[in-house]
Amino acid sequence: MALKLLTLIALTCAAANAAKSSYKLCVPAAYMKDCEQMLEVPTKSKVALECVPARDRVECLSFVQQRQADFVPVDPEDMYVASKIPNQDFVVFQEYRTDEEPDAPFRYEAVIVVHKDLPINNLDQLKGLRSCHTGVNRNVGYKIPLTMLMKRAVFPKMNDHSISPKENELKALSTFFAKSCIVGKWSPDPKTNSAWKSQYSHLCSMCEHPERCDYPDNYSGYEGALRCLAHNNGEVAFTKVIFTRKFFGLPVGTTPASPSNENPEEFRYLCVDGSKAPITGKACSWAARPWQGLIGHNDVLAKLAPLREKVKQLADSGAADKPEWFTKVLGLSEKIHHVADNIPIKPIDYLNKANYTEVIERGHGAPELVVRLCVTSNVALSKCRAMSVFAFSRDIRPILDCVQENSEDACLKSVQDNGSDLASVDDMRVAAAAKKYNLHPVFHEVYGELKTPNYAVAVVKKGTAYNKIDDLRGKKSCHSSYSTFSGLHAPLFYLINKRAIQSDHCVKNLGEFFSGGSCLPGVDKPENNPSGDDVSKLKKQCGSDSSAWKCLEEDRGDVAFVSSADLSHFDANQYELLCLNRDAGGRDVLSSFATCNVAMAPSRTWVAAKDFLSDVSIAHTPLSLAQMLATRPDLFNIYGEFLKNNNVIFNNAAKGLATTEKLDFEKFKTIHDVISSCGLA
């Protein structure tokens, strides 16, 4: 009796513990409200979930590894990133599939489709054919074919370091195939994209619109590649099984056959061994993309069943209405929301089942091209390494490597001496770096919704009569701090360039020009005024709040010299810009800063040496990474706080990257030279 009682108590306690099971779901901080709304959804399961905020999915993986969270939804590429984290014990324990193919082992399988009578019996004979692809950088139409073809001796080598890895790919494909259709953005830089499409134009010649070679195109995408094959004189198409079956009206999973004008008997799958298989039968796939799913640390296996059931019930609850949390928190979608249990498996083994690791790790032939980014702190080194693995997982090449030096100047010297390829500088340091280390700018940060550089601007109150610089002589001025481009360097350069003041003793002369008094914060600091000149006029208009916008608001000044990034402090109904960059002067609204300003401000800029890698190679990885993450900062927020530090590698305020135009750089050099004559640069 006592034994039965103890057994009953033990079972009751076990049930209670199971009922009280709780799990920590990691979610990008931007989606915390959505996660909390999800927690309010009633389910049969009484398992408790807790939302743990992280910077992004990359940080979520670290949180799971460190037991700060238990699990996180991931893509196959994230599984690869997870496999590279030291001392990790991740397991993939649930898959996200489609209702159409709930039992399919993979999300999709890559196939080659050819005309049945095409005289071909091995993959080498693909050389010289007319090829149809889904689009550049896509899995079944681009990445997987390249992974397969580069193993063949007849495929051109892709290790020419005089051009970028991406151009190596395009050059090889254009040499191997007679004509093709490969639409999309070949480069994140518009000029490079245009140049490549001109040079390798026959990679576009099979498209509906060869001159554009971009989406939308009738011969792009999964079905478009098959249309290209069937109706546009194509000889081989690279696509996936499910769309091949749909194209020919064949049943797919739970979806029955449907009428089609296409005849499957006229086409065949081309297998890796060179044999052909009927379209109506089992496809011979040679690589696949795994399903998305949930990844957790090994400890979740001890109490896996209740967690799996909870996730399934939440997925079922959200399937009809697709609330925000459905996608943003659980990672489900309109098509992919069937949650299936799988045998828990290590991420790398999960990818290997589909031969997908090989696709991710596809190289270009030894020696692999590497771009070395120089950084100056341990935190920046950690971020650089995280960026490197993430970019590699997303097929962004060249490989990013990280070099650490103890100062900005040491990094610039490292680039000059070919110890690294890239280093960043802020503001007018870009011109100084060019002069001292013989470097040149490659790309820079852009800001705001419009993704533009910042500009030095002159703000005045509406109703005033100022239209050009001469109208301000003898007036009062407000400035951003002494060390800033917008507050000091730009207005000084403008006044000197317009011969409104002399370049000798230029700061003192600035005070003479605005003889009504100024507020230039920091002008009286010993390091800024080593000779101890009388700069009282330049401090005369400063109050308890020395910000330029407060100075103008309180009528302590007639004009404020600030950055366009500061315009949010000004009421557009009360203030306007003075267009000093226009010969006729004039005024414009605050939002017109790109065309009404004092000068473009140099952003944080990355510089390179002239004698080593091409600028296109150097810029491709950072620009591609920025382009990919522009709409998906939840994957990796490269502009956000990193390990509780701000402005690591990129400024927090940045919204993207852009190549630096030579003309803009020449202007910065001119400004630098003029300001140097004042002894300021």
Curated annotation (Swiss-Prot):
Hydrogencarbonate binds at residues 134, 138, 140-141. Transferrins are iron binding transport proteins which bind Fe(3+) ion in association with the binding of an anion, usually bicarbonate. This transferrin binds only one Fe(3+) ion per protein molecule. Its main location: secreted. InterPro entries: Transferrin (IPR016357), Transferrin-like_dom (IPR001156), Transferrin_Fe_BS (IPR018195). Glycans are attached at residues 218, 355, 418. One of its GO terms (biological process) is iron ion transport. Residues 1-18 form the signal peptide. Disulfide bonds join 26-60, 35-51, 132-228, 181-207, 204-213, 271-284, 374-411, 384-402, 478-551, 506-678, 579-596. Keywords: Disulfide bond, Glycoprotein, Ion transport, Iron, Iron transport, Metal-binding, Repeat, Secreted, Signal, Transport. It comes from Manduca sexta. Gene3D superfamilies: Periplasmic binding protein-like II. Fe(3+) binds at residues 75, 108, 222. Residues 23-364, 371-676 form the Transferrin-like domain. The lineage of its organism: Eukaryota, Metazoa, Ecdysozoa, Arthropoda, Hexapoda. Belongs to the transferrin family. This is Transferrin.
